[in-house]
Amino acid sequence: MKVIVDTSVWIEYLKNRPSVTELIDRYLLTGKAYTVGPVIAELLQGAKTEEDYKTLNSNIGGLPFIETNLDDWILAGKLSFKLRKRGITIPITDCIIAALAINHNAAVMSFDRHFQSIPDLRLETAPK
């Protein structure tokens, strides 16, 4: 199964948090870890130095990538619309990540709890 690793998990991975690095390294070796545009943009924007930016950019390029298509954008809007009707506001970038997971038969691994509010989204448990 494909797992879209969210930015919150990658941040802990880059901090060398043992429980996270162990699991993500296993996913990387087995080809389960995938990335998407919003995660790449968030990681790159958070780089502290030019050198960090270059390293991140180089390493991200080696991950399996799920492209965003029109159906994904439409589903992201629909998810956001339905959640807001229930009084739940989630960043549109996370709605896009959820839409990509739903439309492309993947799960999402994240430390962000708001993903739990999204119907039909499979979640992969992030390590403690």
PLM-predicted stretches and their roles:
Residues 1-35, 44-58, 128:
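Short, well-structured N-terminal submotif of metal-dependent ribonuclease cores
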Residues 6-7, 43, 76, 101:
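Generic structural signal for small/hydrophobic residues in well-ordered secondary structure
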Residues 63-109:
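Active-site neighborhoods of divalent-metal-dependent phosphate/nucleic-acid chemistry enzymes
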Residues 18, 30, 34, 38, ...:
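Residues at secondary-structure transition points
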Residues 1-2, 98, 102-128:
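Acidic, PIN/NYN-like endoribonuclease modules and their adjacent C-terminal/linker elements
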Residues 6, 94, 112:
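Acidic active-site catalytic centers that drive phospho-/nucleotidyl reactions
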Residues 10, 24, 40, 93-98:
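Alpha-helical structural signal
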